[in-house]
């Protein structure tokens, strides 16, 4: 719903533009009813996809450490929610540098921020972290949950993102349910068997739902 931060004139222009389209592609199943409610005639899901050619899966949990936070401290990313949940366990926290990062974030002493990275640099870097937290209320492409799934890293996130729900079913919570998110954070940290279960499951689910072959199969089903 980022367009609702535009001027009123541009909001109306946006709605009229997508209403006039023959069909609209969206990221998530949960987006379909929204766009149809806006008046779009034909709405289809185009799943997010990554082609990991040349990348090594870093799925060993013994050498992993730290928590990677999925977004900055603005409402779009829900960075404060992620920070509060991650702070419930004694693991070092790492943050990402997105375009809407605030200058004051560098003053938070217990977060070490990654520099801006190319996608390939990003994918090689994130395999070292043991946990992911991305409590983003807005529905977008969900690449954070997907990228960490490739490395077998469990992610705590909100319902509404297909990548989160399909790849991390045991660590997905209702929007705003920080209590359950904190419970899961502690369980991942304290219960080795639960962590192993989530890690192995997300590796399997990545191949099932987000491999190139799975993407093509889903595309053909949705587009005939």
Question: Each PLM stretch: what is its role?
Answer:
Residues 4-24:
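Membrane-proximal helix-turn-helix segments that form the acceptor-binding/catalytic region
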Residues 51-119:
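Conserved catalytic-core segment of nucleotide-activated headgroup transferases in glycan assembly
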Residues 111-126, 139-141:
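Conserved active-site histidine-acidic residue motif and adjacent donor-binding/catalytic loop
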Residues 127-140, 153:
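Acidic donor-binding loop of glycosyltransferase active sites
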Residues 169-179, 187-192:
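Conserved acidic donor-binding segment of nucleotide-sugar-dependent glycosyltransferases
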